[in-house]
Design a protein with these regions (language model features):
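Conserved active-site segment immediately N-terminal to the catalytic lysine
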Residues: 131-142
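Buried hydrophobic positions in well-ordered alpha/beta secondary-structure cores of metabolic enzymes
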Residues: 11-12, 54, 86, 120, ...
Length: 200
């Protein structure tokens, strides 16, 4: 973790599972809280929680979006990683593509901002404003939010779901499955309950 929050002291007592009513309440509460912190309209955006990391969440975006993803912005380590990942996801370009960029490239300290894109905000949120009208915005529980590591946070514009693979496709990287489970306050995989508690 970096930024002003360099140390995290946590003592957590978890006495419920990820399928418990307490977790469902925690999940729904955290959804509302994160949308408020992000300043995103709950009628226009959904928020998903993915056990793992911000990097895994970005990989899930590449896996889930139907069209190819072009990486734009300043060069740097994460620009190169996402470009490589994009090249490893061959998709038909006949119907267009979507742009993705890293808002704060930590390898060189450069920032980039463009509206109406997919945004890697893992190292920028919440100290940098979310760019205007993002299709998807990805961050994580640790880094600048200062909670325990292990939870990716993905905001998706509701009108963008038509660009996402069906929830019928079984994969732990399928964002649509996280949306389906999120409606009932759960995740499709075992959730890191302690991280949810600490983030709240």
């Amino acid at each position: 973790m970096f930024g002003p929050n360099t140390n995290t002291l946590a003592t957590l007592v978890t006495d419920f599972s990820h399928r418990d009513t307490k977790f469902i309440q925690l999940y729904k509460s955290l959804q509302k809280c994160m949308l408020e912190i992000a300043g995103l309209d709950p009628y226009k955006y959904d928020v998903l929680f993915i056990g793992g990391s911000g990097t895994l969440s970005i990989e899930s975006v590449f896996w889930s979006v139907k069209k190819p993803i072009d990486v734009i912005g300043n060069g740097g380590l994460w620009y190169e990683k996402w470009t490589t990942l994009s090249e490893q996801q061959p998709k038909n370009r006949m119907l267009g593509s979507h742009n993705l960029y890293c808002q704060l490239e930590t390898s060189n300290g450069e920032t980039f901002e463009e509206p109406d894109c997919i945004v890697d905000g893992i190292s920028s949120f919440p100290y940098y404003d979310i760019p205007k009208n993002p299709k998807i915005f990805v961050t994580c529980s640790n880094k600048q939010l200062g909670a325990l590591a292990g939870l990716g946070i993905v905001f998706i514009r509701k009108t963008f779901w038509e660009e996402i693979q069906s929830d019928k496709i079984f994969s732990y990287m399928n964002l649509a499955r996280y949306r389906t489970y999120g409606v009932i306050g759960q995740t499709p995989t075992t959730a890191p309950v302690a991280v949810f508690q600490h983030l709240k």
